[in-house]
């Protein structure tokens, strides 16, 4: 009897030891979490987006946005931190074609998707940056040509299928000068280059710094893209702060029903050793750091400032 009790004790003891060893073993992270820990966490993040303000450059045919304090519809009084413990902002945006954008094809063709109908697979892609700023410095009306793309590929290799291609012109360095919206000469992307990128390299979409694809009288490049079901990015910023190859881009925008334009947020995810950007852990995130000055409403500017 004692022998059986002893054997039972041994079995239970071994089971406990095995269980203890099992729970002590670290559970491997799922593959995508490993990608975050090993690559994305130490990467450098660069914002490629303009801030929307009441004075940003806007095509004159749309008019300027206006900001105001949100009011209680019953009393007409603005919400305040002192009286209501919160404040909010009312935005009078004359168009969804404003600032840094993602153009859905429905902007020119109602048979294709609007902004809320774009697939979630747009969220993150390889980023290619093709520089033409030196040629633009000589000719403000210069447009990306197929030869510029081939020259880039000779140095960096073939453009990845499904990637996003941004064209660096440094046009955005004068942002937010209002005159940018009235210029008739500005850098663009030629129709031949657009067709090559989409039909030969099968990219997801391209992006440019100006508010239009090209300066042709009929906007031939934009017309071809949107009428044939392609999207494009406009008003992209800070392309001088991202590498020409090796980065990713995240793509975010509000999901407005039937939207014919998209206020977009583009973030470049660059290699850890890149000279620009910020990495996870370098600045407070949760909680975020308090600012040196509090936000307040500036009546003259018509916007909250610090």
Task: Please name every model-derived segment.
Residues 22-306:
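Active-/binding-site microenvironments in catalytic and ligand-binding cores
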Residues 8-18:
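Bacterial N-terminal signal peptides
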Residues 1-9:
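Bacterial N-terminal signal peptides that target proteins for export
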């Amino acid at each position: 009897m004692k022998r059986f009790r002893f054997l039972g004790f041994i079995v239970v003891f071994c089971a406990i030891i095995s269980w203890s060893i099992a729970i002590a073993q670290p559970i491997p992270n799922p593959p995508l979490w490993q990608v975050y820990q090993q690559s994305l966490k130490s990467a450098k993040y660069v914002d490629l987006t303009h801030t929307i303000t009441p004075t940003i450059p806007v095509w004159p045919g749309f008019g300027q946005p206006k900001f105001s304090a949100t009011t209680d519809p019953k009393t007409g009084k603005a919400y305040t931190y002192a009286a209501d413990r919160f404040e909010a902002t009312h935005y009078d945006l004359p168009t969804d074609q404003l600032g840094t954008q993602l153009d859905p094809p429905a902007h020119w063709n109602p048979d294709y998707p609007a902004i809320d109908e774009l697939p979630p697979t747009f969220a993150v892609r390889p980023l290619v940056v093709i520089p033409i700023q030196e040629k633009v410095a000589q000719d403000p009306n210069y447009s990306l040509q197929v030869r510029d793309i081939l020259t880039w590929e000779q140095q960096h290799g073939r453009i990845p299928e499904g990637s996003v291609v941004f064209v660096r012109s440094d046009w955005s360095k004068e942002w937010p000068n209002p005159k940018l919206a009235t210029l008739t000469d500005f850098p663009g992307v030629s129709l031949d280059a657009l067709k090559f990128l989409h039909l030969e390299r099968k990219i997801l979409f391209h992006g440019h710094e100006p508010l239009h694809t090209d300066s042709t009288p009929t906007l031939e490049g934009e017309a071809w893209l949107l009428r044939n079901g392609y999207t494009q990015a406009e008003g992209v910023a800070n392309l001088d702060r991202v590498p020409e190859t090796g980065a990713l881009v995240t793509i975010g925008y509000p999901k407005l029903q039937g939207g014919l334009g998209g206020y977009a947020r583009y973030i470049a995810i660059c290699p850890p050793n890149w000279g620009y950007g910020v990495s996870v852990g370098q600045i407070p995130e949760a909680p975020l750091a308090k600012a040196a000055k509090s936000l307040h409403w500036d009546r003259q500017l018509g916007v909250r400032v610090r």
